[in-house]
Amino acid sequence: MKNLFILLISTILFSSEYPSFTNIEISHIQKKSKIAKNRVIDYSKKIKLFTSYSKEKQLRAVNVYLNRLLPQYDDIITNKENNWATPKEFLTVGYGDCEDYVIIKYYTLIKLGFDDKKLFITVVKEKFKGGSHMVLSYFKTQCSSPLILDNLSFKILPLDKRHDLQAEYFINSTGVFKLSKNLNLLKVADRAKEFEELEEKVKNNL
């Protein structure tokens, strides 16, 4: 009876939209970690709740909800630098580096109906610390300063208000871009290898 209940719950909660989990996957996740299974189910419930929100409220809700998952660096998790985890991998493990937060926010917002052409995985330089970081940019309108979703901040601000960040590259399915002074996106490459590899894994529902 308990197993039947789990199957019914997972069938109801997980749609065909990515990220989706099969009943077999849910069963495997539960065997490894009940916490991970609960996290996966909670994610689906939260996204269903967020569908009734306005776009502005969805941005805030997604940023706050996913930021609450704890960070841990790639070299600790996989012994591989710059490992781009899929949302399913991220949800199963429960933590990740900055790019993993960006990626799950990117696909979650697409799942909620955001235009993927307005969302960009963004490599930035931290002006005061001198290191590299990754955030998600959302261009609400053309030639406007993009809104920044950052795993280090619960507040969403436009890029021109983030004086601590300098945008380097904007990446999505349309290519790799730089931002001009008048806020136009200028294409510098047709594709990014890491993003292509990520998209391939997502297409295979990994």
Residue ranges and their predicted role:
Residues M1-K2, F139:
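Generic cytosolic/nucleocytoplasmic N-terminal low-complexity/intrinsically disordered segments
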